[in-house]
Swiss-Prot record:
Function: Catalyzes the transfer of a ribosyl phosphate group from 5-phosphoribose 1-diphosphate to orotate, leading to the formation of orotidine monophosphate (OMP).
Any one GO MF annotation of this record: magnesium ion binding
Reaction(s) the record says it catalyses: orotidine 5'-phosphate + diphosphate = orotate + 5-phospho-alpha-D-ribose 1-diphosphate
Name used for this protein in its record: Orotate phosphoribosyltransferase
Species assigned in the record: Streptococcus pyogenes serotype M2 (strain MGAS10270)
Keywords, in A-Z order: Glycosyltransferase, Magnesium, Pyrimidine biosynthesis, Transferase
């Protein structure tokens, strides 16, 4: 079993991901979605947490061997990033969604040196907007952002477009395609549900039609 399928299995088992193609969720954007993800709960399950953190470390070593600092996005990327930095004996920092409105007005908390090679940790990629904003902030502070590594992606076309336009490399430990395949295999969804989930990936607006 691949790492992607192992993580997909764990996310379903601990209910970090819910699939309801026949009774969809409503995202903050107003989009009706057959999937809901809360990867924060992975921190409460040591087996799942270890699988994810070890996966992060292996992936970073394979794709970004020159990394010098790990950064987490506030707030979901902070705990994972801190654990990864500890495992890799690397400095850690975190990136706020916007600068503080008091004190020194920092957006990056921690010490990042000019030109330091950074990998940013995120828990979930939908369109990628927030983590790309974080990457831009890190670049403005002088970091050399090598890429983003995340637990899971919905594989939305908008995300691919956004990362391509930003020139930022994205790697995820698991993904939507792997997840729905595992969900069908393990009986979480029906054939009809699988069909709807595939349609959502292709067209997030009209998938129910």
């Amino acid at each position: 079993m691949t790492l992607a399928s192992q993580i997909a299995t764990q996310l379903l088992d601990i209910k970090a991901i819910y699939l309801k193609p026949e009774d969809p969720f409503t995202w903050a954007s107003g989009i009706k979605s057959p999937i809901y993800t809360d990867n924060r709960v992975t921190l409460s399950y040591p087996k799942t947490r270890d699988l994810i953190e070890n996966g992060f470390v292996e992936t970073i070593r394979a794709h970004f061997p020159e990394v010098e600092v790990i950064a987490g996005t506030a707030t979901a990327g902070i705990p994972h990033g801190a654990i990864i930095a500890d495992k890799m004996t690397l400095p850690f920092a975190y990136i706020r969604s916007k600068p503080k409105d008091h004190g020194a007005g920092n957006q990056i908390e921690g010490r990042v040196l000019k030109g330091q090679k950074m990998v940013i940790i995120e828990d979930l990629i939908s369109t990628g907007g927030s983590v790309l904003d974080a990457a831009a902030a890190a670049s403005r502070e002088g970091a050399d952002v090598l890429g983003v590594v995340a637990i899971f992606t919905y594989e939305l076309p908008k995300a691919s477009q956004n990362f391509k336009e930003a020139g930022i490399k994205l790697i995820t430990l698991s993904n939507y395609t792997e997840l729905i395949a595992v969900a069908k295999l393990q009986g979480y969804i029906t054939n009809d549900g699988l069909h709807l989930l595939k349609k959502f990936k292709e067209d997030q607006v009209n998938w129910q039609q």
